[in-house]
């Protein structure tokens, strides 16, 4: 099977942004108060208008991904246990969202932070929509998928981002690039891998101990987890 080629995935822009999720990214505890809700609603309109969601994906066998250096670390291997192949996925909201976040923050720090939270929520919505499309594709093939697993989870290093981007040809197909520090640009972008199997698989669910946000997580400070919200 080897790797690729990458293919575009059609994404429809949602009618709205998940404000509850954005409030959590914003740091609202126990739900947004009236002022926070109003701020998020106000900032959501121009941010959604600025979004141009795009996604690309490919299928590859695990041996080829390993040989390419993409499956570095033990945790991603655990996630792919029982799988015969994997899908690579990249999703981006486009440069307009980054620009809108910067505009919103000029002279209004709260609006900038709110817009950033909204962008994160919208990126997750786009990734969920892309994953749903891939699950439909897998079902037509009689296949099953694990959940998404992204660089930075567990010991899967961010250093694989350039390899993922190159395999998916994200610069040409989606305008998505990787900086010298292995960060994605546009910033509101997500890359991930999903295992493919002939039987139902769950994948390795990274708990709090593996989360890249564990040292600054607001949920952990409150003695709960994001999964419980």
Where in the sequence are the language-model features?
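Short terminal or interdomain "cap/linker" segment that borders an active site or interface and mediates
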Residues: 141-219
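Generic secondary-structure signature for well-ordered alpha-helical cores
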Residues: 45-52, 135, 139, 169, ...
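Conserved mixed alpha/beta catalytic, RNA-binding, or beta-rich assembly cores of soluble enzyme
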Residues: 83-147
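Short conserved micro-motifs at the rims of enzyme active sites and ligand-binding pockets
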Residues: 101-102, 221-223
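Metal/cofactor-centered catalytic core regions of large enzymes
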Residues: 34, 74-78, 210, 215-216, ...
